[in-house]
Amino acid sequence: MEITNVMEYEKIAKEKLPKMVYDYYASGAEDQWTLQENRNAFSRILFRPRILIDVSKIDVSTTVLGFNISMPIMIAPTAMQKMAHPDGELATARATSAAGTIMTLSSWATCSVEEVASTGPGIRFFQLYVYKDRNVVIQLVKRAEEAGFKAIALTVDTPRLGRRESDIKNRFALPRGLTLKNFEGLDLGKIDKTNDSGLASYVAGQVDQSLSWKDIKWLQSITSLPILVKGVITAEDARIAVEYGAAGIIVSNHGARQLDYVPATIVALEEVVKAVEGRIPVFLDGGVRRGTDVFKALALGASGVFVGRPSLFSLAADGEAGVRKMLQMLRDEFELTMALSGCRSLREISRTHIKTDWDTPHYLSAKL
């Protein structure tokens, strides 16, 4: 069967993967309202395309933190990719490098930073949680630096693990034979097989619930790598992130896996962009499944997007080739959207190219 869009990979992955694994990747917190809303909110944003513009040449390339990449579509950190495919993060790394874009490696990966680096050249970021034992954090960051990773994506929306009910029902645990490779030798590689998500006790015991803004300064003191703050969805926190020297912000609700009933990231994006006032770049993850979604995010001020579940499902369906094709499809759709909207480069994508349901007060539109 010819795969024609990114969503089709999820159907294949659901058929191929054990229920426990598919549910772990696919589910969100509690009622999963935000999980649905991350997608639905994109569908409420409409285009205002401009016509009769020469779009015979289109450039989708961009720069992120000074690094040249082929397109504003990057790979978000997702945990334990060997549950999806035996090659796990190595396949994702190779596919991302081939596409000329950035991969963010989860610190809860089933391949180590060194193994991922060994796949060849590529621009890679390292996702980090801060643990009570700061020595663990120092070791992880140093290893990422030495392996040539270019930035730290600090996850800040997880003082505790969200309640994912399918994981509780399935008694989720890391399948036998897989380990969290970055923690080998740190006495943290084993997950307690409790009756919750299996990760909850691990996170509760190790992730530092007292994490605060001052810890960003501490992190800057142990690394020269730029720090992206991942998990900002309000203007207030965006301003503080700038004050504390964040190199960038990732507007993220953790794939709707943490606090349910937070806004879709595409809805929260513009508030954050306006608060930042162009001082640092703002990125988005959550719900991106089409090239049209990428365009909408950029029109609302994002410098680029990260995709998470599409990489997992394409990996499960067809390994490295699946991830390559997924990225190529998103790129092709995005380029087509640019052409049909009258944009030849990312610079030309503007707020005037879209209409959102918060643009015009409803009472006003009712009068027109």
Swiss-Prot record:
It is found in: Peroxisome. The modification N-acetylmethionine is found at residue 1. Its main location: other. InterPro entries: Aldolase_TIM, Alpha-hydoxy_acid_DH_FMN, FMN-dep_DH, FMN_HAD, FMN_hydac_DH_AS. The record marks 108 as: Involved in determining the substrate specificity of glycolate oxidase. One of its GO terms (cellular component) is peroxisome. Its EC number is 1.1.3.15. PROSITE patterns: FMN_HYDROXY_ACID_DH_1, FMN_HYDROXY_ACID_DH_2. Its cofactor is FMN. GO terms for biological process: defense response to bacterium; hydrogen peroxide biosynthetic process; oxidative photosynthetic carbon pathway. Pathway: Photosynthesis; photorespiration; glycine from 2-phosphoglycolate: step 2/3. The active site is at residue 254. FMN binds at residues 77-79, 106, 127-129, 155, 230, 252, 285-289, 308-309. It holds the Pfam family FMN_dh. It catalyses: glycolate + O2 = glyoxylate + H2O2. The keyword Transferase does not apply. Glyoxylate binds at residues 24, 129, 164, 254, 257. It comes from the Eukaryota. Keywords: Acetylation, Flavoprotein, FMN, Glycolate pathway, Oxidoreductase, Peroxisome, Photorespiration. Belongs to the FMN-dependent alpha-hydroxy acid dehydrogenase family. PANTHER family: GLYCOLATE OXIDASE 3 (PTHR10578:SF113), S -2-HYDROXY-ACID OXIDASE-RELATED (PTHR10578). Homotetramer. Catalyzes the oxidation of glycolate to glyoxylate, with a reduction of O2 to H2O2. Is a key enzyme in photorespiration in green plants. This is Glycolate oxidase 3. It comes from Arabidopsis thaliana (Mouse-ear cress). The gene is GLO5.
